[in-house]
Amino acid sequence: MILSCGEALIDMLPRTSTAGEACFAPYAGGAVFNTAIALGRLGAPSAFFSGVSNDMLGEILADTLTASKVDTRFLARSDRPTTVAFVKLVNGQATYAFYDEGTAGRMLSTDQLPALPATISTLFLGGISLVNDPAASTYEALQARDCGTRVTMIDPNIRPGFIAGKEAAYRARIGRMVARADIVKLSDEDLHWLEGQGELTALARGILAKGPKVVFITEGANGARAVTATQDIFVAAQKVTVVDTVGAGDTFNAGVLAALHRADALTKVGVASLSDATLTAALSLGTRAAAITVSRAGANPPWANEL
């Protein structure tokens, strides 16, 4: 089973009321939450760990997970409020205003870390949950605790505007977590933010030198690549009409993990010896699933039968 660990929040998405007025409607979201949902829909064994409120918005989150076949037994429930993000869409690109102080997600602490059964093979971490303490330190502690026995994957999903005034501490945390991870996923923009300018494969090999076994890089509408010490495999993206890009990278992550699960490769040994065929299958499922997500509004990952 793959345990996605990170933020769950309510996206307030812009809509138009029946009276023609501008309004916002609540939708379950969060980068890591979206990956858990996409994994469940793709038929992979998926579970989710996060701080989730007992309020009505928290119930929306829990119900949405259950509807997509995600195991919710590891949720750390509390009476703190739910994180809310108001979303503005301009030409399909999303910008966010976050309301996160004192929430169930942000205040997650190490004493809420679950004891995990042996059936959990893989931890997926990332997103804005790695920015603010105490939650960020809690997720890092979970990775540090379990990285010796379970596969861990990280996608920082970097939002430079969200880390203003915290960049040094954030870079240090991401550096530590990347070094512990078996699998790293970065957009081309994130890779440049972390490693500077240069050719993508060379920069990815710099990441590999820190400890990971494979780096997946998404290159927007062009496609995605997988880089190991000896491999550099690229798969072109499907051409689709883009409605918006919300959840695209999150869905890609799920496709990669689902494909690796299908190949029985989510073990420490398996991730260290991925074949060209397995990497190609992972890139293919990731890009195909993401193409469906961007072709419709919001983070609405595909079910397996849609592929």
Regions found by a protein language model. Give the residues of each.
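Short glycine-enriched, charge-decorated loop/helix-capping segments at active-site entrances
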Residues: 18-26, 164-167, 272-273
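Active-site metal-binding loops of divalent metal-dependent hydrolases
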Residues: 8, 31, 128, 156, ...
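Conserved phosphate-binding/catalytic region of the ribokinase-like
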Residues: 196-307
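Conserved beta-alpha-beta core of the PfkB/ribokinase-like small-molecule kinase fold
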Residues: 122, 128-205, 212, 222
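Short gly/ser/thr-rich secondary-structure transition/capping motifs
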Residues: 101-110, 164-169, 271-272
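Hydrophobic anchor at the start of a short beta-strand
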Residues: 45-46, 72, 150-152, 215
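Glycine-rich phosphate/adenosyl-contacting loop at the front of the ribokinase-like
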Residues: 1-70
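Conserved N-terminal subdomain of the carbohydrate kinase-like
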Residues: 45-128, 132
